[in-house]
Regions:
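N-terminal cap/lid segment of alpha/beta-hydrolase-fold proteins
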Residues: 1-28
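The alpha/beta-hydrolase serine catalytic core
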Residues: 18, 128-255
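Short, surface-exposed "cap/lid" segments of acyl-processing enzymes
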Residues: 26-64
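Alpha/beta-hydrolase active-site loop signature
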Residues: 41, 74-78, 141, 232
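Conserved alpha/beta-hydrolase
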Residues: 56-79
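Primarily recognizes the serine-hydrolase "nucleophile elbow" in alpha/beta-hydrolase
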Residues: 95-155
Length: 255
């Protein structure tokens, strides 16, 4: 297979610099583009390594599907500045879409989101007509459990490194309401007629098959559900899930 052109780059979002990895298809010429949205980090200081393996996925999409692919770190993770908030991460996704739109030969922009990144990708797609379609992998339908106790969530966010600035947020309760207000089921109907691809492992311990089914159904005829037998929550490490995702990308129609 041909090599891709890849570069480490940055994106500006609300004046915050986000770190990113862009992979370019080897064949050159017009091609569709996709932004890859990561989920929440886990473990102490996990934000520093958040999305560390996503550039590999971007490279593979560019190489095997012939797409422009962008793996970026939302604010508060990886090499990106800023602090986590739902509104901030949604702004970061919009900034990634704008970045891809500026590629001269990009033929439309799609989103791929994993875990919580998939949930926010659904919200972003519903709100932004520039986005041609969305794939959500192992994505929870809401963040209500996260937002139920804002103080505890903030403690977690500081522990993993998603929130670094003293005094942030100005209002813990308002910050928490932004988290608990996330509802992919309410957003999904607004995606149609653009496609929503929902991928779930049948052994996922965090998101159930029924959760995924309800999300796909919420998009009506635009929704498509695929299940990976025996796969857990870390779908991006399962070759069957990756193959299913790439098959979906191959079926998309560029502008």
């Amino acid at each position: 297979m041909e090599d891709t052109g890849a570069l480490e780059t940055t994106i500006s979002s609300d004046g915050i610099t986000l770190s990113a990895h862009r992979a370019t298809p080897a064949q050159g010429g017009p091609a569709p583009a996709v932004a890859i949205c990561h989920g929440f980090p886990t473990g102490p200081r996990g934000a520093a390594a958040s999305a560390a393996t996503y550039p590999e996925l971007a490279d593979r999409i560019a190489r095997e599907c012939g797409w422009h692919a962008l793996a970026f770190n939302c604010r508060g993770t990886g090499g990106s500045g800023g602090d986590f908030s739902v509104a901030g991460w949604l702004a970061d996704i919009r900034a990634a879409v704008s970045y891809l739109e500026e590629i001269p030969d990009a033929q439309g922009v799609w989103l791929v989101g994993i875990a919580e990144g998939g949930t926010l990708a659904v919200l972003a797609t519903a709100a932004d007509a520039r986005i041609r379609g969305c794939a959500a992998l192992a994505a929870p339908n809401t963040f209500k459990e996260w937002g139920r106790d804002p103080a505890r969530l903030l403690e977690f966010a500081r522990r993993v490194g998603m929130v670094r600035t003293p005094g942030f947020p100005a209002s813990v309760q308002a910050w928490g309401r932004g988290v608990s207000g996330v509802d992919a089921l309410a957003a999904a109907p607004r995606i149609a007629p653009r496609p929503l691809f929902v991928l779930i492992g049948t052994a996922d311990s965090l998101v159930t098959v029924e959760d995924a089914r309800v999300l796909a159904d919420a998009a009506g005829e635009a929704g498509e559900l695929r299940m990976v037998g025996g796969a857990g929550h870390e779908l991006r490490h399962d070759p069957r899930a990756t193959a299913s995702l790439m098959g979906w990308l191959d079926r998309q129609v560029p502008v």
